[in-house]
């Protein structure tokens, strides 16, 4: 169970900019769901990324030679989202809320608990964050964009197709009026996707 008052989420196929946690915490509020995005590193650059590169600061700037070369070769996408700008400028550039993406978001623990977190009945790949987002909206938790602030780099991998079951679950979530899921954060034992 999370001990802090703000919960920050990231995917296992990504790595954050060194200021990522600070960016989320500086923008945190009592009710806001903070929605970041990702720079999509390409299939040629991703296998060559090392922990040493990250620790050496080679991803501290979107304009580093390693990233620029990859972008100019058509390998890396959404590089503009990797440019960190001061908060007042980011708010002017991105005034409207963005969709919640599980790869990069944070929210008050109280909001997560209020909607009972992720729905553990959602046992198919992908888009479980859409269900969570809809319940947070229904519960009155506004979204706030963190584009050009909380930067995350996504390592390339083949994408999976949305299954019919996933599409059915998304449609059911969109048609529902539920704020809380039945099987979520309050479970004693969470769903283990590995079995």
Predicted region positions:
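Active-site-proximal specificity loops/subdomain of glycosyltransferases
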Residues: 1
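Active-site donor/metal-binding and catalytic loop motifs
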Residues: 146-163
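Conserved donor NDP-sugar-binding/catalytic core segment of glycosyltransferases
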Residues: 19-69
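Short aromatic/hydrophobic "clamp" motif used to bind/position activated sugar donors
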Residues: 7
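Terminal low-complexity segments of carbohydrate-biosynthetic enzymes
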Residues: 103, 138-142, 163-195
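The conserved acidic donor/metal-binding loop of glycosyltransferases
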Residues: 11-15
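Short, flexible, basic/aromatic active-site loop/helix in glycosyltransferases
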Residues: 54-97
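A short, conserved alpha-helix in the catalytic core of glycosyltransferases
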Residues: 99-100, 104-116, 123-142, 147
